C-alpha cells in the first residue's frame, strides 16, 4: 500500500497551516511536510522570488507537482500552500485522497486574526499593495474551494496551534465514532458519510 498523509491542511495565508502541521506532527510523532517548502527546494529560491522571476503560472505548476508528490509519498501531516487548492488537478487529487479515507482540514480564519499572523509582508506576493483588501478578495475567491475540498472545517480564530491541533484530533475521533466531541468545539465535519 502506498503512503498517504494522516491529514492534509488547507486554508488561506495566516490560518496557521504550517504551525498547526508542526503541532500535530509533534503530538502524533509523525513527520510534517509543507508544499511551499517543497516548491522552494525544487526551484532553489523563495516563493516570493518564483512569483517575481518566473510568474504565478510557473509557481502553480511547481506547486501542483509538489502536492501530487506529497500526497503519494508522505505519510505524516501535510500543509498545502494557500492557493494550491485552486488548481483543478489538485482538487481532483484531494478528492481521490478523501475518497480513499483521507481527511482534508480547512483551517478557517477571519481577516482580523489572519492580519497579525501574516504581517502582510513581501514574502506573501499575492498580498502586496493593499494587503487587507487583497486578502479579503482571495478569501472571497477561495472560500468555496476550501469548503468543497474539506472533510472538516476548524476555525483558528483566537486560539493557538496546540488548541487547533486538539480540535482536529477531536474531529478525527468524531469521524471514527460518529459521535460529536464532548467539548463541542472540535470542528465541523463536512463528510457526506
Can you annotate each of these PLM segments?
Residues 9:
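Hydrophobic anchor at the beta1->P-loop junction of P-loop NTPases
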Residues 82-85, 110-112, 159:
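Short glycine-rich anion-binding loops that position phosphate/pyrophosphate groups of nucleotides
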Residues 34-95, 124, 132, 136:
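ATP-dependent small-molecule kinase phosphotransfer cores
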Amino acid at each position: 500500500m502506498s503512503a498517504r498523509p494522516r491529514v492534509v491542511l488547507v486554508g488561506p495565508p495566516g490560518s496557521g497551516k504550517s504551525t498547526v502541521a508542526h503541532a500535530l506532527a509533534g503530538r502524533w510523532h509523525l513527520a510534517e511536510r509543507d508544499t511551499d517548502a517543497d516548491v522552494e527546494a525544487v526551484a532553489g529560491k523563495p516563493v516570493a522570488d518564483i512569483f517575481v522571476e518566473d510568474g504565478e503560472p510557473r509557481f502553480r505548476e511547481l506547486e501542483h507537482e509538489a502536492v501530487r508528490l506529497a500526497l503519494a509519498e508522505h505519510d505524516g501531516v501535510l500543509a498545502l500552500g494557500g492557493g494550491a487548492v485552486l488548481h483543478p488537478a489538485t482538487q481532483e487529487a484531494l478528492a481521490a485522497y478523501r475518497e480513499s479515507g483521507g481527511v482534508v482540514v480547512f483551517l478557517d480564519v477571519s481577516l482580523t486574526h489572519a492580519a497579525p499572523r501574516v504581517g502582510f509582508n513581501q514574502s506573501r506576493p499575492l498580498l502586496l499593495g493593499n494587503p487587507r483588501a487583497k486578502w479579503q478578495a482571495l478569501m472571497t475567491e477561495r472560500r468555496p474551494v476550501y469548503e468543497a475540498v474539506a472533510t472538516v472545517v476548524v476555525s483558528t480564530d483566537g486560539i493557538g496551534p496546540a488548541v487547533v491541533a486538539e480540535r482536529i484530533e477531536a474531529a478525527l475521533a468524531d469521524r471514527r465514532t460518529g459521535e460529536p466531541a464532548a467539548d463541542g468545539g472540535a470542528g465541523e465535519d463536512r463528510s457526506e458519510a
